[in-house]
């Protein structure tokens, strides 16, 4: 709940740096690795990056700040945060609390789908170290068959269990002792390893063609509305505005911390991570003589495996790459499971470990059953439920909560208070953009 007595009992981040790193960890995920480079390649390098940067600035300075501030103001996850907003407007918490379960369930659904993907990632990380990946060589039929078997019904049971176990262990130690500590270890290593991969790939013959393409801008391409739509979609989903993860992490933030500054850092480092992935994958594909025309799991588990097996030092590259992917996945999945875990604690008074166990048992049971349809599962969640959660959070905070609550919440602890421009920008421009994400995603079969 959001009263002071209960807030004081809650776990939280020990430091501003820990909060920022954890939020970066939640944002840096598969979208940065298997979707962003594909979009950069498909839509013309810098032609795509320019609108992408603009949308990162817009969403980072509106939605990310807003969700952090909403969570901190309530001192709770989406259920109580939405209840706080309806109470501020109408004196009734119940309507907001009921609506707040939508993004919580969305977070759980996305976490379950992610659990399946993490099973694949752990399996391929193991194969990279035991020689299984390199043994396939460049036999595309064998590479495809291995992935198809992995992504089939009951195809990665052991590794799905491993994924759930890793998440459960980290989260059982709480926010400071588990989530913050894990992110402080994994995120710096991820960035360092990606930089190392980028340096190595840059030395490969033919890699320069990939870099040249990334930095090419075609002015005519900027007139294509689809470039802007997909750039917006990628920025929107990459920054993890969905009314759940950012809200719950914000609820653990000290009231003395500067939220606008934290949001800027999250947006900056998420973008750096995405660019690092592009600077590794696009030149690597160019060096391997392959075209980057397929995104999603196929890029990571089929085409990149084929390319890495054909390059000098490919066995080492594969090991480093899949460790990076595993770290990105773990730091994202613990954020996705946190909102439902925290909701059990807040609504039913469960202790941390039992609440974590209940959610992870549910996650494991469903994940094992949906392995063959996880792509369709993730499409439904990401196209409809996540944007809906973001829209509900935006409407609750900026429309129902009202200007006074918004500005007080955002400026609490701010080194330089945000001016009057922030509220109308969020209320009208940001809320409208979230609605666009929902409608465009439904119309185009996903934009992020």
What are these regions (language model features)?
Residues 14, 21-31, 107-111, 115, ...:
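Hydrophobic, membrane-embedded alpha-helices of multi-pass small-molecule transporters
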Residues 1-34, 63-68, 72-98, 254-258, ...:
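Membrane-interface "cap" regions at the ends of multi-pass membrane proteins
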Residues 327-336, 355-366, 382-409:
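Hydrophobic alpha-helical segments of multi-pass membrane transport proteins
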Residues 368, 372-398, 417-448:
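A generic transmembrane alpha-helix motif of multi-pass inner-membrane proteins
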Residues 7-11, 39-43, 73-102, 115-176, ...:
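Inter-helical loop and helix-membrane interface segments of multi-pass membrane transporters/permeases
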Residues 18-19, 26, 157-158, 269-275, ...:
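Loop-to-transmembrane helix boundary motifs in multi-pass membrane proteins
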Residues 2, 118-151, 252-256, 261, ...:
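Helix-loop-helix connectors at the membrane interface of multi-pass transporters/channels
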Residues 2-13, 180, 184-330, 354:
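Membrane-embedded translocation segments of transport machinery
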């Amino acid at each position: 709940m959001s009263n002071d007595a209960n807030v004081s009992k809650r776990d939280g981040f020990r430091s501003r740096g820990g909060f920022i790193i954890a939020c970066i960890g939640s944002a840096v995920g598969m979208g940065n690795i298997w979707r962003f480079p594909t979009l950069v390649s498909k839509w013309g390098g810098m032609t795509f990056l320019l609108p992408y940067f603009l949308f990162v600035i817009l969403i980072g300075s509106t939605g990310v700040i807003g969700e952090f501030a909403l969570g901190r103001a309530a001192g709770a996850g989406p259920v109580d945060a939405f209840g706080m907003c309806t109470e501020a407007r109408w004196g009734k918490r119940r309507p907001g609390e009921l609506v707040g379960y939508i993004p919580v369930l969305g977070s759980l659904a996305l976490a379950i789908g992610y659990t399946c993907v993490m099973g694949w990632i752990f399996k391929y990380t193991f194969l990279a170290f035991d020689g299984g990946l390199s043994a396939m060589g460049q036999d595309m039929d064998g590479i495809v068959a291995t992935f198809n078997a992995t992504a089939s019904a009951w195809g990665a049971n052991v590794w799905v269990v491993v994924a759930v176990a890793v998440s459960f262990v980290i989260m059982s130690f709480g926010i400071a002792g588990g989530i913050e500590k894990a992110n402080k270890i994994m995120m710096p290593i991820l960035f360092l390893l990606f930089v190392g991969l980028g340096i190595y790939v840059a030395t490969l013959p033919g890699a320069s063609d990939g870099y040249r393409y990334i930095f090419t801008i075609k002015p005519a391409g900027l007139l294509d509305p689809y470039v802007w739509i997909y750039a917006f979609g990628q920025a929107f989903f990459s920054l993890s505005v969905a009314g759940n993860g950012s809200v719950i992490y914000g609820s653990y933030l000290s009231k003395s911390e500067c939220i606008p500054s934290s949001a800027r850092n999250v947006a900056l480092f998420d973008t750096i991570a995405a660019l690092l992935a592009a600077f590794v994958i696009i030149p690597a594909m160019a060096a391997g003589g392959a075209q980057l025309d397929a995104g999603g799991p196929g890029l990571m588990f089929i085409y990149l495996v084929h390319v890495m097996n054909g390059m000098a030092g490919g066995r080492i590259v594969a090991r480093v790459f899949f460790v990076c992917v595993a770290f990105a996945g773990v730091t994202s999945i613990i954020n996705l499971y946190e909102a439902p875990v925290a909701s059990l604690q807040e609504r039913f008074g469960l202790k941390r470990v039992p609440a974590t166990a209940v959610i992870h048992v549910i996650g494991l049971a469903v994940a094992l059953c949906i392995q063959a349809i996880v792509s369709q599962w993730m499409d439904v969640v990401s196209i409809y439920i996540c944007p809906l959660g973001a829209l509900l959070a935006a409407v609750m905070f900026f429309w129902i909560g009202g200007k006074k609550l918004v500005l007080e919440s955002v400026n609490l602890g701010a080194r330089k208070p945000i001016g009057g421009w922030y509220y109308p920008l969020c209320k009208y421009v940001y809320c409208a953009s979230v609605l666009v994400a929902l409608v465009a995603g439904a119309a185009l079969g996903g934009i992020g």
